[in-house]
Amino acid sequence: MLDRLKMRSSALVMLVLAGLGLPRCDRPAPLDMAAYDALYADPVPVLPDPKRIYFIGHSLIGRDMPAMVAQLSGARGAGYESQLGWGASLKSHWEPDVPVNGFEVENAHPRYRDAREAVASGDYDAVVMTEMVEIRDAIKYMETHDYLHRFAAATWAANPEARVYFYETWHPLSDPEGWLERIDLDLGRYWEGEIMRRALAHDGMTRPIYLIPAGQVMARLVREIEASPGLPGLTDRTDLFSDDIHLNDQGLYLVALTHFAVIHQSSPEGLPHALLRADGTPADAPDPTAAALMQRIVWEVVQSMPRTGVPPA
């Protein structure tokens, strides 16, 4: 009887924690570094073209960035769909009883497809996910590692050949810890240490989840342009942003290049820099010299990081 009461009490505690959005205590320990490194020891074979992509996230994906990826991909792409929200967590995209803030507004376009339905369909060669900002709150309250694991497992169950990607974003420019400082620290301590390594520690997770290191690319570009000002239209970090957190068209172009390079395992150097937004209007194009710098930096960064799956230079 006592054991039964303990089991009931534990179950009740877990329900209360979930209802309050508080962290659970049963999260797996991060996959040890030797096993984690082994998953990425060999570059992944290139997926055959054309590739169909599905995006899950929020306004740091938005409508325009996937449209830019599709234009950069050209005949290598086979279309894309998405489910978005305002600051939406992966948990809200998975759980039917957890609301996705801004759902009606963000998904009022022809590229919308329900997230659970999409990954279960087996229709996609690449599934790209990101987590809400602030990443520390997502880890603490939204069980990010678990929902990354759930979406990845569902994707592979429907299409064993599909690739799963985790898109590293950033935090507000005004972050008191320092914008560049946090990008340097957060990749290891949060994106990989608390999310990817815990997701891959779940039972049955024997395949890598690949990283789209947009934050690292942005930090590298910002360091270069702020150390050597004078590039037309790109002199400091604010030239990539429309506000404290969201990107302007130049910033979106940089992130789209990063997605292209990782998913296609191909250099973005020489790609077009004058693209359209999702609504068909011309995006504000970077200066050709700035675009060439972006393309070079993207390729150097993704080649230098084994978690991207891209072969090293």
Regions found by a protein language model. Give the residues of each.
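Alpha-helical cap/lid subdomain in secreted, periplasmic
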Residues: 113-249, 261
